[in-house]
Design a protein with these regions (language model features):
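Active-site phosphate-binding strand-loop segment of PLP-dependent enzymes
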Residues: 100, 104-175
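Conserved PLP-anchoring active-site segment centered on the Schiff-base-forming lysine
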Residues: 70-92
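Short acidic capping loops at alpha-helix termini that bridge into adjacent secondary structure
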Residues: 47-54, 74-77, 124, 184-187
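A short helix->loop->beta-strand "cap" motif at the edges of active sites that frequently abuts
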Residues: 76, 97, 155-159, 183-185
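A short helix-loop-beta submotif of the ANL/AMP-binding
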Residues: 94-100
Length: 217
């Protein structure tokens, strides 16, 4: 399916503007920041500071790259779901970090195995990846799961990243990890237009978190 007609029409109109084809600010136009913050407010009821808590990205893959570079050092460990998206492991391995898989429980709707996680040695874990709604399983997180994940990250001082490009798919009520109280302190969330708006080739996404993490990313 192509993007909506309104999207294509707007692209054609903007393409005819005289300043549309020059270099743009590295961090994105202020209007784009504001639009993304507005999207979060309308969709999830989450208030974000458009200037300091939102970073436009070239799809989730760029976000995965920059977050890994910002937070992971050689010899540290990264928690990755099994099954999960292979890209979460690639850069960590290049940087010399150790990828540690944690299981998703099939008969519990592919929720994380928190019992397994709590039994792990987490002393060298710097970053944890989650992906809900999940690819490849299609499992969807519950708000209870999001709350447990935020609590887990807080107690173990781990940066938690949820990749959320499927928020509108098979889901009448889109959810975000950022709806959990205190999530911004330890968590980062990616959203992408690729799946929800049929725009994979446009490479439009966003990263939201606290101002300190945004400055590092």
């Amino acid at each position: 399916m192509p993007p909506s007609k309104q999207t294509i029409d707007k692209l054609c109109a903007v393409a005819n503007e005289p300043d549309a084809h020059g270099y743009q600010p590295t961090s994105g136009l202020p209007e784009l920041h504001s639009a993304m913050a507005g999207f979060y407010k309308r969709t999830y009821g989450v208030d974000l500071d458009a200037k300091t808590e939102v970073q436009p990205i070239i799809g989730s893959k760029e976000g995965i790259l920059h977050v890994t570079l910002a937070f992971v050092n050689h010899g540290e460990e990264v928690l990755v779901p099994n099954p999960g998206y292979p890209t979460y492991t690639s850069l960590s391995k290049i940087l010399g970090a150790k990828v540690v898989n944690y299981d998703l429980i099939e008969n519990d709707g592919w929720q994380p195995d928190f019992e397994q996680l709590e039994q792990m040695d987490l002393s060298r874990v710097k970053l944890m990846w989650t992906n809900y709604p999940n690819m490849p399983t299609g499992g969807n997180a519950r708000m209870e799961t999001y709350k447990k994940l935020v609590d887990f990250a807080r107690r173990h001082n781990i940066v938690l990243v949820n990749d959320n490009p499927y928020s509108f798919i098979r889901n009448e009520h889109p959810m975000s990890l950022m709806q959990v109280e205190g999530a911004k302190e330890y968590c980062i969330v990616f959203n992408s237009m690729s799946k929800s708006h049929n725009m994979p080739g446009w490479r439009v996404g966003m990263c939201v978190t606290n101002p300190t993490f945004i400055s590092w990313i």
